[in-house]
From Swiss-Prot:
Transmembrane regions listed in the UniProt entry: none
Gene3D superfamilies named in the record: Cyclin-like
Designated gene of the protein: CCNYL3
Alphabetically ordered keywords of this record: Cyclin
Cyclin N-terminal domain mapped to chain residues: 40-170
A GO BP entry: regulation of canonical Wnt signaling pathway
Gene Ontology CC: plasma membrane
Protein name: Putative cyclin-Y-like protein 3
InterPro entries according to UniProt: Cyclin-like_sf, Cyclin_N
Species this chain originates from: Homo sapiens
Signal peptide: none
SUPFAM superfamilies documented for this protein: Cyclin-like (SSF47954)
Entry similarity comment: Belongs to the cyclin family. Cyclin Y subfamily.
Amino acid sequence: MACAVFQIPPWHLDRKYGSCSTILLDNSTASQPDLRHTLERYANRSLAIFEEPVHPLPQEKLPGKSFKHDPKRNCIFRHFCTLFQVIKLTAPCAIVALVYIKRLLTSANIDLCPTNWKKIVLGTMLLASKVWRNHGLWSVDDSQNSKDTAVENMSKMEKCFLELLEFNIHVSASVYAKYYFDLCALANDHDLYFLFSFLHKDKAQKLEGHTSQHSLSLGPCRVGMENYATYSPLSSQPVLGALSLAEVLPQEIKQEIHQVLMDHGVPCHYTCFLLHPEDSTLERFLVLHSIQGLQEDSVLCKVEIHGLSPQPQTYQSHFRSPSLAELLNRISGTCRNHFAGMQK
C-alpha cells in the first residue's frame, strides 16, 4: 500500500474535487472569467509581430534585459498585470486578444520569439479592448497604456494588425467558449490550479445563467424537463444548455421519444455518460461537453430517460436554439399520445 501511495503525484493529493454531495467551484465561468486566473493561464501564451530591438517599446535601456532567452511565465504575468491595470481591461479582453494572436499565427505565418511578444500583446489588447467596448475609440484614449509609445506608433500598429488579420475581428460565442475552456485545460495540464470553495446560495446567484423548468402531468407519470443554459457576453442567444427528462417514464415510450428526436433532425446517439439530477451542476456539464463540436448560437441538448432498465438512457446533440421550444413540444406530444392510447 505504501508503494502505491508514493506513485500518486503529490499535487493530486492536495486537490479537491466536486462530487454528487459537494460542489467545489472557483470564481471563474465562461461568461464571467476571473481576471487573475485568466492572466495566469494566458501567461503561457505570447506571440510576436514586430522586432522590439528595431522598434523598442521602452525608449530607455533596461538593466539586465535579454532578447536571447524566452521570458519566464512570471515575467509575462507581471507584464500582463501592469498592462491591465493601466488600460483597465477585463478578463474577457484577454481571451479575445488570444483569439487574435492565434489568427495572426495562421494568416501572417509569424512565429513566437522573445524579442517580439510585448508588441504583439500590446497590439492585440488594444484591438480587443476596442472591439469589446463595441464603440469607436480614438487611439489617444488608450495612449496612457505606455508612456513611451507614441499615438502615431499605436495607430500604425493597429493598422498593421488589422491588415494581417484581414479585418477578421469577429469572435463568435462558440470560439470564445472554446478558448476559455482550452485555457482551463492548459492550466490543469501544467498543474496551475486554484483554490476552490463550496458552492453556496449567494455564490450560485452570481453565476450568469438562466434555468427554466417545465413540468407536465401525463397519465400516471410526471415528466420534468429542464433547460439550463449560460449566456456569453458576445451573444444574446444561449450558448450551452441541457434538456433533461428526469422523472420516471415507461419503458415502452423510450423508442418513441428517440424517434421524435430523429424526426426533428437531431443526430442523437447513446452515450455512457449519465448525468443524474443530483450532480447536474453547470460547471461539471460544461467541462465535459462544451469544447468539441460547439457551434455558434447552438444548444447542447441532453435527454435522459429513466425507464424499467436499471440504467437510464442518455441522448445528447447540438441544435439551433430556436428549436428548443419545438423539441419540448414534440416530446410532450409523444408522451401525451402514448398515455392517451393506453387509456383507450
